[in-house]
C-alpha cells in the first residue's frame, strides 16, 4: 500500500483501463446475468452505505427488504412468505440446506440430500461446508429430474430433496409437483432452486408449476440479479413460513437486532433497494414483455442454428438454447477468438447459449454470421 495516496484522476484512469478489458455484455451468450435496469442502478447508489446486518440502525432499509420479499412472495403464490435478500443462488441454496438440517435434528455426519444430476454446483459446496452427503439422481430423457430415481436414493438419513426450476445447462424445469408429493410422502424438506427460472416462468404464456403453489415446497431460491434485472449481488431466499427461517437464528448480542439468520453478517441494503425498485417499476406487465422478447429471440436463435445443421439437445423451455456440434469445445474456442463468449454443457456435450435481454435480434444476427465462418 502507498504511503501517500494518488489523485482521483489517476486512480480512475487505472480503473477505467481495467474495466475496458472486460467483455461487454453484447458479446456474451454464456452468462445468466445482464445489464441491470437503470432504476436498479439508481436505487443501488442511493442505499450504498446501508447495512441490513444491523436493521435497527437502518429500519427504513429493512422495511424495503421486507416489502421486496413480499413482492417476490406474491410472484411465487405466497405473499406472506418470509426470507431475505442474499448475495445470490449459492448462498440461498446453502442456507436452505442449513434449514433442512436444523429441522431434522439429525446427525449431520450421516445425513444426505437427494438432488438431480442437473443441480447447480453450489450444492456440492453446501455438501462440503455442512458435512452432509450428496446423492445425485439420473435424469429422464428430457434432462429433467426423474422422481422414481430420486425415490430410490432416499433412506432414513435423507434430510432433503432438491428440485430445479430452470437448470443451469439446459434451462429445463423439473416435475416439481411429483417431487413435492415424494417429499410429503417421506416427510422430507423440499427446496426449489429457481435462481434463473424464478423471474422467467411466472411471466410465460403457460407457466409451469414450481413454487409455493405446490404443497411440499418449503423454500425457494430466486435471483433478482439474473432475469429480475437488479444489480449484482441480489439473490433471494424465501420460506413458506417464518418458523423455517427462525431455525437459523444466531445470537448477535453486540448488534442492535440481537439475532441474525442470514449467512453474511454485513449485508448491503443496496441489493434489496435495487431489486425492490425494478420490481415496482416494471410490474408484471413489464416483466412479461421482457420475457416474451427473450423467448422470441430464443426461437430465432434456435431456428438459425438448426439451419446450420446444429439441432437442439432439447426444445428450449426457457431462454436457453443448447445445440449439437461436432466439436463443441473447439467451436467455443474459435468463437472466443472472434470475441464471442458461449459455454458448453457436460452431459451431453453441446454448445450452450443464454438469451438474456442484452442478446437482441441484432446481436443474434452478428453472432450467427461469425458462427457460420467457424463452424
From Swiss-Prot:
Q: Does the keyword Membrane apply?
A: no
- Which GO biological process annotations does it have? carboxylic acid metabolic process; coenzyme A biosynthetic process; methanofuran biosynthetic process
Needed cofactors: pyridoxal 5'-phosphate
Which EC number(s) are documented for this chain?
A: 4.1.1.11, 4.1.1.25
Query: Is Lyase there in the keyword field?
Result: yes
Source organism superkingdom: Archaea
User: What Pfam families does the record tag this protein with?
Assistant: Pyridoxal_deC
Please name the pathway.
Cofactor biosynthesis; methanofuran biosynthesis; Cofactor biosynthesis; coenzyme A biosynthesis
MF-aspect GO terms: aspartate 1-decarboxylase activity; pyridoxal phosphate binding; tyrosine decarboxylase activity
PTM N6-(pyridoxal phosphate)lysine: list the residues. 226
Task: Return the InterPro entries for the record.
Answer: GrpII_AminoAcid_Decarb (IPR050477), MfnA (IPR020931), PyrdxlP-dep_de-COase (IPR002129), PyrdxlP-dep_Trfase (IPR015424), PyrdxlP-dep_Trfase_major (IPR015421), PyrdxlP-dep_Trfase_small (IPR015422)
| Keyword line | Decarboxylase, Lyase, Pyridoxal phosphate
Q: Which reaction does it catalyse?
A: L-tyrosine + H(+) = tyramine + CO2; L-aspartate + H(+) = beta-alanine + CO2
Q: To which protein family does this belong?
A: Belongs to the group II decarboxylase family. MfnA subfamily.
PANTHER family attached to this UniProt entry: PTHR42735, SPHINGOSINE-1-PHOSPHATE LYASE 1
What biological function has been recorded for the protein in this entry? Catalyzes the decarboxylation of L-tyrosine to produce tyramine for methanofuran biosynthesis. Can also catalyze the decarboxylation of L-aspartate to produce beta-alanine for coenzyme A (CoA) biosynthesis.
Q: What is the name of the protein in this document?
A: Probable L-tyrosine/L-aspartate decarboxylase
- Which species does this protein come from? Methanocella arvoryzae (strain DSM 22066 / NBRC 105507 / MRE50)
Gene name as annotated: mfnA
Amino acid at each position: 500500500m502507498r504511503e501517500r495516496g494518488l489523485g482521483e484522476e489517476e486512480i480512475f484512469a487505472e480503473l477505467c483501463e481495467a474495466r475496458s478489458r472486460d467483455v461487454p455484455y453484447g458479446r456474451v451468450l454464456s452468462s445468466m446475468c445482464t445489464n441491470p435496469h437503470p432504476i436498479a442502478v439508481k436505487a443501488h447508489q442511493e442505499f450504498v452505505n446501508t447495512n441490513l446486518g444491523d436493521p435497527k440502525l437502518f429500519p427504513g432499509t429493512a422495511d424495503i427488504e421486507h416489502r421486496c420479499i413480499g413482492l417476490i412472495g406474491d410472484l411465487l403464490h405466497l405473499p406472506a412468505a418470509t426470507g431475505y435478500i442474499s448475495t445470490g443462488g449459492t448462498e440461498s441454496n446453502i442456507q436452505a440446506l442449513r434449514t433442512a438440517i436444523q429441522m431434522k435434528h439429525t446427525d449431520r455426519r450421516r445425513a444426505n440430500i437427494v438432488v438431480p444430476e442437473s443441480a447447480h454446483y453450489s450444492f456440492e459446496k453446501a455438501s462440503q461446508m455442512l458435512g452432509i452427503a450428496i446423492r445425485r439422481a439420473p435424469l429422464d430423457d428430457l434432462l429433467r429430474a426423474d422422481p422414481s430415481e430420486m425415490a430410490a436414493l432416499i433412506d432414513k438419513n435423507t434430510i432433503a430433496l432438491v428440485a430445479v426450476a430452470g437448470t443451469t445447462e439446459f434451462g429445463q424445469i423439473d416435475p416439481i409437483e411429483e417431487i413435492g408429493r415424494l417429499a410429503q410422502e417421506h416427510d422430507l424438506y423440499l427446496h426449489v432452486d429457481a435462481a434463473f427460472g424464478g423471474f422467467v416462468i411466472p411471466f410465460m404464456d403457460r407457466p409451469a408449476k414450481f413454487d409455493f403453489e405446490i404443497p411440499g415446497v418449503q423454500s425457494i431460491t430466486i435471483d433478482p440479479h439474473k432475469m429480475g434485472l437488479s444489480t449484482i449481488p441480489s439473490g433471494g431466499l424465501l420460506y413458506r413460513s417464518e418458523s423455517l427461517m427462525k431455525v437459523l437464528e444466531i445470537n448477535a448480542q453486540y448488534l442492535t437486532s440481537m439475532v441474525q439468520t442470514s449467512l453474511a453478517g454485513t449485508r448491503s441494503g443496496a441489493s434489496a433497494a435495487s431489486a425492490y425498485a425494478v420490481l415496482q417499476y416494471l410490474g408484471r406487465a413489464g416483466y412479461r414483455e421482457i420475457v416474451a422478447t427473450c423467448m422470441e429471440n430464443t426461437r430465432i436463435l434456435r431456428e438459425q442454428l438448426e439451419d446450420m445443421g446444429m439441432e437442439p439437445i432439447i426444445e428450449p423451455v426457457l431462454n436457453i438454447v443448447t445445440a449439437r456440434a461436432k466439436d463443441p469445445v473447439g467451436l467455443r474456442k474459435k468463437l472466443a477468438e472472434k470475441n464471442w463468449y458461449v459455454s458448453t454443457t457436460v452431459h451431453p456435450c453441446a454448445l450452450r447459449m443464454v438469451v438474456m435481454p442484452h442478446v437482441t435480434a441484432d446481436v443474434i444476427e452478428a453472432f450467427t454470421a461469425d458462427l457460420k465462418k467457424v463452424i
